[in-house]
Amino acid sequence: MSDNDKPKLGMRAPLGIKRTVETSKVKQSFSHGRSNTVIVETKRRRVINKPGSGDAATAAETAKKQAEPVENTPNKDTAVTQTATKNETVATPAAAPAPAPAAAPKPVAAEATAQETSKAAPAAAQPVAEKEAAAPASAEAAKSAAIKVTDRGAKKTTEKNGANASGNRPSGNRSQDNRGRQGGRGSQNKNQTRSGGQPRQPRTLAHRDLASRQELQARLLREAEESRLQALEEARRREDRLKQEADLEEQRRIEEKRRLEAEAKVEAEKQAALKEKEKAEAKARAKAEKEAKAAQAKTAGAAEGEEKTRRPAKAAAPKAREERSESPRSPAPRRFTPVSPPRREAPRPAMRDRKGEDRRQSGKLTVTKALSGDEGGARARSLAALRRAREKDKRANQNRAQQVRQIRDVVVPEAITVQELANRMAERGADLVKALFKMGVAVTLTQTIDQDTAELLVTEFGHNIKRVSESDVEIDSSSDVDPEETLKSRPPVVTIMGHVDHGKTSLLDALRGSDVVRGEAGGITQHIGAYQVESPSGEKITLLDTPGHEAFSEMRARGANVTDIVIIVVAADDGLRPQTVEAIDHARAADVPIIIAINKMDKPEANPQRIREALLQYNVQVEAMGGDVQDVEISAAKKTGLDELIEKILLQAEMLELKANPDRAAEGTVVEAKLDRGRGPVATILVRRGTLKVGDIFVVGEFSGRVRAMTDAQGKNQKEAGPSMPVEVLGLSGVPQAGDTLTVVESEARAREVAAYRAEIALRKRTTAQPASLESMFSALKDKQAVEYPLLIKADTQGSVEAIAGALNKISNEDIRVRILHQGVGGITESDVSLAAASGAPIIGFHVRPNSKARDIARRDGVALKFYDVIYDLIDEIKAAMAGKLGPEYFETVVGKAEIREVFSAGKHGRAAGLLVLEGYIRQKLRARVLRNDVIIYNGSIASLRRFKDDVPEVRAGLECGITLEGSTDIKAGDIVETFEVEERARTL
């Protein structure tokens, strides 16, 4: 029974991946004449051709192979093997990368192919252990599957052959039944058998079985390859997962290690601190025990010495001591020994009778024991006595420690509070107050004492004093002189001075090639400007332009102090004016050379010779008049004579040998300072020596700062400024005074210290009262009687503020004086308006304006805001306002004088006076006063005027008349009557 004929247990065929098996019958003939019909499995042969090859070639090759006669039976295995190898090569080119051997002795070709596949698989495996294990496993599985299929096919073939041998069925029917399936193959086999006389070997069946096995083997190899690739992919994924897990584990382990290290460190610190604490406690405890033992030993030694002096020396003392040791219960004299329990012998086994003993007397000192000298037992010292001894030693040690006092060096300034001095001495403040009270000075801890009193205290407490002065903080630049080898030539600083409208700024414009006059309000200079120009020869000259108005005398003085050469501009058509003379005085006070520039020579009325002669009145002698002062005739408008002027400036600078050290910390002078709304405080600095750089820390006046930016006269940013170079500096903490010195320091702390000291000195000067004198008392009384005119001044620059304040103070007199509540640089703010509203003062704004909020507050509170651009207008209006506050002036003019000759009654009018007019005239309703012995006894007016009995309006000199006075009858003969008129005039200052 074949596999297909076996009975099925189930109703349905089992599911599987096997295809339906097709069978056919083949007649097998043997050499001895017998034949056998064999049922074989029929499979269609599939030939896989290479691309480009046709089906005809394949069919011809197949027919040729089938037509070859089978010569020998022993070569069947070899042929089958070769065919299998060739078909395998064609069918599965991807499964066998290595070429198969030409002949294999084994009957199954799948085994060789599986072995080759298994050999190739490990070569492609990865070096990972899992991948190496997966590849051989897949190869072994493929090999075993191929062997099983081969064995199963061989077994089926054997069973079929046996069935055919026992059946004896005719082969023709089988061949005819399978003719439709076999096609021409059955006929061909049949014809071959008939024509040949010999039985033909079933090569076609072997080829079909071999093809089916090859297909199965190829499929299994493909599945094995897919399994191997899948296993490799899974191994790679597993390796990546394990690697990630290992990284995470490593990171967790590192974090855990760090945490444990931190905890261990904290624990170690705690343990160390605990050990230190325990060590300190043990040390203190050991020290206390050592002191206690020392005290006990000292007390015991003293007690033993006392006992030896009291007790007589006996030869039998050792014997008595032995007896006392044998009987410790006997009474013994009192001994001062350290606290320790008395030694006792070991308890005896037998208890003796104690009825006769007096235990209450044991260990007590009696007269009998003391006289007999019995020292049978040592008396222990009480705890109270030991405690008292310890306290005594402790007090002695404390007194000894107090006697050792640390001597300190105490720095004492000119003024210091008691508490601060106590802190520096490390003493209690109460002790210093007690010491001062003993000296007769009653102060508290917060009061200030002078340096001499502080020195007495420091000396009394045993310390050393170190006297310092507050001025030590100040920077002393006078002693800082640069060595001669470090000096280098620098440009000259030239100041242009002169009267108003004489052409100073026009000359500067001609030298600079700019137009500064057009930017000034009213065409006059009201600020001091600093510029630097370059001569045609390439040498630089620094120019300072000063105002010519009389209010700016302080600016002119500052300009003369920081300059090297002064150019005094005199208009040839106007001559010498007051400010011209003042400029000459400033230049002489500063001891700088003068160059006279006679300007406006282009006008027809110019007379330079008259200018030279007028200068002789002020001891200015030009070279043309035999002197040493240079003079130049120029015209700033026509730009004539400028080259000669520059030449003389450079000649004068060469004679002066101007030098400075550029390689040092910078020092400069504030030429002008202002508060810019966008940039903050800005100062124009003229560097005198050193180099000022961006980032330098400096002190200027009462303020400190750091150079944030520097710009020159053209508005270009500069990184550094050398000697004689004017720059605008940003970065100040406040607006300094014009003329203050700028000094670069090493640190911000030093800058703040110096600035704080200068601010304190300035505040002290403002608040310190002047010593009282008779003159100052009368002056203060006069000031109180005078009317005050309060106001606030805000200007764009510090120099303008000073000029306005000085000019307003000059117009004050004994009747009214200006009281400046506040003066500052910058715009008008809300705080300025609030201060003015509280005092009822107007606010003067010079080149500044208020912000919108300040304007609203001023409108609400009724504060007057006055704005000016020209200082002339400001001074004139303030004068008029001050005069208006005083009111008009009244002037008396005596128009008549008469003498009373007779007094008579006038009825209801009282008393009338008969007069003789001596001077002038007397009119009715004129104001009159009565003088008696040159003392005014009446001041009023004339009620009525009569001549004889008629009322007259006027009586002139030489005539007689009668008058009555309003509200007065105290008149006598001989009194003088004066009549006068009062004229009201507007007050002027």
From Swiss-Prot:
Keywords: Cytoplasm, GTP-binding, Initiation factor, Nucleotide-binding, Protein biosynthesis. One of its GO terms (molecular function) is translation initiation factor activity. Residues 545-548 are annotated as: G3. Its main location: cytoplasm. Gene3D superfamilies: P-loop containing nucleotide triphosphate hydrolases (3.40.50.300), Translation factors (2.40.30.10), Translation initiation factor IF- 2, domain 3 (3.40.50.10050). Residues 105-146, 294-303 have a biased composition (Low complexity). Residues 149-159, 234-293, 342-361 have a biased composition (Basic and acidic residues). Residues 43-219, 234-379 are annotated as: Disordered. GTP binds at residues 498-505, 545-549, 599-602. The keyword S-adenosyl-L-methionine does not apply. Residues 72-87, 160-171 have a biased composition (Polar residues). Residues 489-659 form the tr-type G domain. One of the essential components for the initiation of protein synthesis. Protects formylmethionyl-tRNA from spontaneous hydrolysis and promotes its binding to the 30S ribosomal subunits. Also involved in the hydrolysis of GTP during the formation of the 70S ribosomal complex. This is Translation initiation factor IF-2. It comes from Zymomonas mobilis subsp. mobilis (strain ATCC 31821 / ZM4 / CP4).
